[in-house]
Curated annotation (Swiss-Prot):
Entry-linked InterPro entries: GLTP_sf, Glycolipid_transfer_prot_dom
Family statement: Belongs to the GLTP family.
TM segment ranges: none
Positions of glycan attachment: 276
Origin: domain of life: Eukaryota
Name of this chain's protein: Glycolipid transfer protein domain-containing protein 2
Record keywords, A-Z: Glycoprotein
Gene name in the database record: GLTPD2
């Protein structure tokens, strides 16, 4: 007995559903309106992410992964995108325990540059991240720049000036969000990026593929802040995720698989350090519920 062919209409629908789903998900990925409207957290509530070490730091995940001894792969060198991203984010960690906004945003620019070639799922996400980065950079270099040199300074200034939103309330005009709220949205996206890269690097052969692992990371870091429709769209979008081997090749060109995995673990560790520092500062100031 033969297998009936799919009707042309069904094939046509399916061929367009994946790109459409990716577009719908990632257009809303860092959307101020969707995240703000769906918080569901009160002003005194704990962070909404289940399993998070709330309200402070996440558990350290990005341990070492050793590659055979060899010269450092180019992706971690002075001209490598991965190395450039790590150095900029690391520079944002101030000795006094603050987070410098200028190097943090420079790190995000490098992260966007790094993620964009990895596939359409990342490409749409990074467009929204780039918008948020540009918005914060305008404040860092704007007329109130003296108040936007670090996370602590920004939060203190916006509180004094009455610029902070009510917890869980989306601003009527997304373009007028506080810098603290915009940073919170980037902060959550950084957690997803960190988890995804770490799981791509450490996934075992024969285990869940990269799409499944990054989908799980989405559910942990961003899903609790998204409405049901966006979460369902995400599930479909991750079906188009590149395979692990392809991601490793794109992330660290010219390196062996072991070297690429080790490089990604180091990069994920840097992102985790920045996330933990930022998480603590936001929690101490009651800013985790701004969106």
């Amino acid at each position: 007995m033969g297998v009936a062919a799919r009707p042309p209409a069904l094939r046509h629908w399916f061929s367009h559903s994946i790109p459409l789903a990716i577009f719908a998900l990632l257009l809303l990925y860092l959307s101020v309106r969707s995240l703000g409207a769906r918080s569901g957290c009160g002003p005194r509530a704990q962070p909404c992410v289940p399993g998070e070490t709330a309200p402070f730091q996440v558990r350290q995940e990005s341990g070492t992964l050793e590659a055979p001894e060899r010269k450092q792969p180019p992706c971690l060198g002075p001209r490598g995108m991965l190395g450039r991203m790590m150095r900029r984010f690391h520079a944002s960690l101030k000795p006094e325990g603050d987070v410098g906004l200028s190097p943090y945003l420079a790190g995000w620019r490098a992260l966007v540059e790094f993620l964009t070639p990895l596939g359409s799922v990342f490409a749409f996400a990074t467009r929204e991240a780039f918008t948020k980065v540009t918005d914060l950079e305008a404040r860092v270099h704007g007329p109130d720049a003296e108040h936007y040199w670090s996370l602590v300074a920004m939060a203190a200034w916006e509180r004094r000036a009455g610029l902070l939103e009510q917890p869980g309330a989306a601003p009527r005009d997304p373009t007028r969000s506080s810098g603290s709220r915009t940073l919170l949205l980037l902060h959550r996206a950084l957690r997803w990026s960190q988890l995804c890269l770490h799981r791509v690097a450490t996934g075992a052969l024969g285990g869940p593929d990269a799409g499944v692992q990054c989908s799980d990371a989405y559910r942990a870091a961003l899903g609790p802040h998204h409405p049901w429709l966006v979460r369902q769209t995400a599930r479909l979008a991750f079906l188009a995720f590149p395979g692990r081997r392809r991601l490793l090749e794109l992330a660290c060109p010219g390196a062996t698989e072991a070297e690429a995995r080790a490089a990604l673990v180091r990069a994920a560790g840097t992102l985790e350090d920045v996330y933990n520092r930022t998480q603590s500062l936001l929690a101490e100031r009651g800013l985790l519920q701004l969106a």
